[in-house]
Amino acid sequence: MLKIIFFLLFLIPFCFINNMYWMVQIMMFFISFIFLLMNNFMNYWSEISYFLGCDMLSYGLILLSLWICSLMLLASEMINKHNNYKNLFLLNIIILLLLLILTFSSMSLFMFYLFFESSLIPTLFLILGWGYQPERLQAGLYLLFYTLLVSLPMLIGIFYLMNKIGSMNFYLMNNFMFNYDLLYFCLLCAFLVKMPMFLVHLWLPKAHVEAPVSGSMILAGIMLKLGGYGMLRVISFLQLMNLKYSFVWISISLVGGVLVSLVCLRQTDLKALIAYSSVAHMGIVLSGLLTMTYWGLCGSYTLMIAHGLCSSGLFCLANVSYERLGSRSMLINKGLLNFMPSMTLWWFLLSSANMAAPPTLNLLGEIYLLNSIVSWSWISMILLSFLSFFSAAYTLYLYSFSQHGKLFSGVYSFSSGKIREYLLMLLHWLPLNLLILKSESFMLWL
C-alpha cells in the first residue's frame, strides 16, 4: 500500500510545473495499473503495516478511486485549456485521491473516521472553486452540514467502542457483538447520510448540479461508496441490533427509491436526473446490505462498483453536451442525434447500463440484491418490481428525450466529439462490461 501512497505524494510537485497536466494524468493511470498487478486475491487483510491493509473489498474500491480520479483529469480538459487554476486543481485531486486510498485501506476504525471526514474538504473545494453557478455556495453548505451533523455522534460511538474493547482494529472488533441501541444509531447514521438514504438525500442533487464535471464524477463514483463501505465494515459487530432495526432502513430505502424514481420522471435538468437516479440505486444497495445475507453483501459491493463507473460516465456525457450547448436543460438538450451522432452510441450504452441491461455489472449486482431482499421478505417484491420498472422508465426518458425529437432551434450546426471524449467514454464502459467475466472476485471476497 505504501508504494502507491508515496507515488502519489511525489506526484504533488508535478502539479506546479507548467504543461504537466497530461503527464500527471498518465502517471495516475500508471499507478492504477501498478495497483492492478498487486491483486493477489487475499480473503484476509494482506500487506498489513500498523494501520494500512487491504482485503478484496477495499481493493476493488481503491482501484475504482484510482480509475475515476484518472478519468476526472481526462474529463476536465476545459480547466487545462482556459488555465483555470489548473495547478491547484491537480493538487486538489491528488490530495483527494490520497485521502480516499487511506480511507479504504485503514485498519483502525478511528483512522477510517478521520480520513472519511477529511475527504469531504477537497470535494467541497472542487464544488466551491470550479462549480458553475453562484448557488454552489448553498450546495457546499448543504453537503457540509448534512455530513458533519451526523459524524459527531459517530465519533462518540467510536470513543465508546475504544473504551469497551481497548482496540480500534477492524479485524479484532469482529470478535465482539454489541447489544446497544444508541451505539448502533450513532455508528450507522453517518453512513446513511453518506449513502445517501432517502430523507437525508437532499444534499446530493444540489451538490451534483452545482459541481463541475470532475466533482460530479468523484461524488457519484466514490463519495457515495464511502457510506456503503463503512457500513459493510461496522455491520459485523452490530448484527444483533441490525436484526432488530433493519426493517426501518430497508422500508425507507425501498419506498424512497420508488418515490425518487417518480421524481426522476419529472426532471428537466440532465444532471439532476442522473443524481436522483443515484439515490434510487443506492437505496437498493442499502437494502441488500442490511439484509445481512451473503448474496446481499456481495450484491451491494458489486452494484457499488458498477454504479460508480456507470453514473460517472453519464455525468461525463451530460458535460459533453453542456460544453457544446451551454445548458443542462432537457428543453435545449434534445435531438442530440442530429447534433452529435456518434455520441448517441455512448448515450445508449451507458443508459442501458444504468437500467441494468446485460452484460453489465449492474445486472449482476441487481440480481444478487433482488434475491437477497426477496429472501428477507417477499412483500418487498411489490416495491422491487416498481423500482425496476421505473428505473427502466426514467433511463428511457433520459435517453429518448435527449437523443430524439426536434433539434433545439438555437443550435445552428452539428458537432463531432473529440477523441479524448470517446476515450473517456470507452474507459468507463469497458470495465463495466468486462468485469462481469471476473465476477468471482465480487462474490468470493466475503
Swiss-Prot record:
What is the organism of origin for this protein? Drosophila melanogaster (Fruit fly)
Q: Which Pfam families match?
A: Oxidored_q5_N, Proton_antipo_M
Primary localization class, coarse: mitochondrion
Compartment annotation: Mitochondrion membrane
Q: What Enzyme Commission number(s) does the record list for this chain?
A: 7.1.1.2
Q: Which residues cross the membrane?
A: 4-24, 56-76, 93-113, 114-134, 139-159, 182-202, 218-238, 245-265, 272-292, 297-317, 330-350, 373-393, 426-446
User: What's the name of the protein?
Assistant: NADH-ubiquinone oxidoreductase chain 4
Gene name, please? mt:ND4
Keyword set, alphabetical order: Electron transport, Membrane, Mitochondrion, NAD, Respiratory chain, Translocase, Transmembrane, Transmembrane helix, Transport, Ubiquinone
- Top EC group: translocase
Traced from the root, the source organism's taxonomic lineage reads: Eukaryota, Metazoa, Ecdysozoa, Arthropoda, Hexapoda
